[in-house]
Amino acid sequence: MPTILRVGPYRFFFYSGDMEEAIHVHIERDDKIAKVWLDPIRLHSSGGFSRSEISKILKIIESKREAMMEAWNDYFGN
């Protein structure tokens, strides 16, 4: 589970078995885990996060999207 970014209480990561899926990132805080597709950016599952937190998370992803996609491609060799 490579962690690609930490911002405040949020950990952004993907699972090593995620290679077969479209490019995405998982976001974790405490016992909550959301999933967001990166191309284009869209919420897949909110994992118990509130709407306001999802909004914050999506803004972080928008600002870091290129780096997240690069980390995915570096890890999976795409």
Question: Across the structure, where does each feature detected by a protein language model lie?
Answer:
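C-terminal structural segments of small proteins and small subunits
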Residues: F49-N78
